[in-house]
Amino acid sequence: MNINEIRAQFPVLDQQVYGKPLVYLDNAATTQKPLCVINRERDYYLHENCNIHRGVHYLSQKATEAYEHARQTVADFIHARGSREIVFTRGTTESLNLLATSFERLFINEGDKVLVTAMEHHSNLVPWQQMIQRHHGQLLVVPMDDKGVLNLDRYEELLKEGPKVVSIAHISNVLGTINHVKQMVTMAHQYGIPVVIDGAQSIAHHQIDVQDIDCDFFVFSGHKMYAPMGIGCLYGKAEWLEKLPPYQFGGEMVDTVSFERTSFNVLPFKFEAGTPNVGAALGLETAVSFLQNLDREAVEEHEARLLQSAIQQLSSIDGIRFIGEAEQRSGLVSFIIDGVHPYDLGTIIDKMGVAVRTGHHCAEPVMTRFGIPGTVRASFAMYNTMEEVENFVNAVKKAAIMLR
């Protein structure tokens, strides 16, 4: 794995910020895009732009074929049984809202329950919360310990309470904890409960096999895996997608329409109302191909070394406290320093060329659990280097001295 060759594919990294080389460590928020992705979307608008599924002319057919080929590529990437199990969405958030809305229309009744975990991003909390509150139901929450590890004994106890659906993060966007999703899916299925996996933080860093996990649904965003913004995916087992009613209504998702009734299209089209983001879907396919052409195991090992190096070096800072210390972690490190506000630290190291995320990371209940207002989060990608980790740690050390 040649880091320099990889970095050369990401022109945004080759710049200075405030006179310092850019160190981009905000990859959990969004990854940068390789030239092949940028060029593919550009080429679509230059040479192929057309609405799909609706025309007999050359451009429409060409764009339709490209779009559906992208769907099949994504299906193969996550080992779905076929392209009909892949619904293109705007991202993880829309995918989860789609599921919450469709589940509600299908079988949520007064007093029902939904099960999530204590480490969820707001996108995997608020849609379920709002849905269940409309029916005077209960949101059950799997607790975690001080290291950011879920209590699976309590999880099983909560499963016995009969939630209608379980929705859990594969990897926490704050803690970096890798949850035992395969085990959790098996446990839920023993009680006949469907499981949704939020894969926003895992899709870029780990090889995903939805059939091996056996989840009923898996959702992710393209922009967190080197693809354009505005495109994401909802994978669902076909038998579940067949049952669920449409989320939105309009063009393309219908079969027949009259003033008296409407029938809906087949999978996956009944969930894709209106004109889709074709260019971004083609960019997503290109990002998938980009990842598949790499040694994924070598990438995982490289990112793990970056994380361990960062943790080891940061540990020497007086007063540092890591938020999330699970043995199985991936991709990121969150921390606070005694007497230093995360926003102040983030602002100062930005002036040193280092981009990190500060705040509650759209996970306020996690901050409440640890009794803090927010954290500094550094998140890594394949194009980051050990030198960048060292620059980041040195910047944090300097900022901490300035702020105390």
Per-range role (PLM):
Residues 1-404:
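Pyridoxal 5′-phosphate
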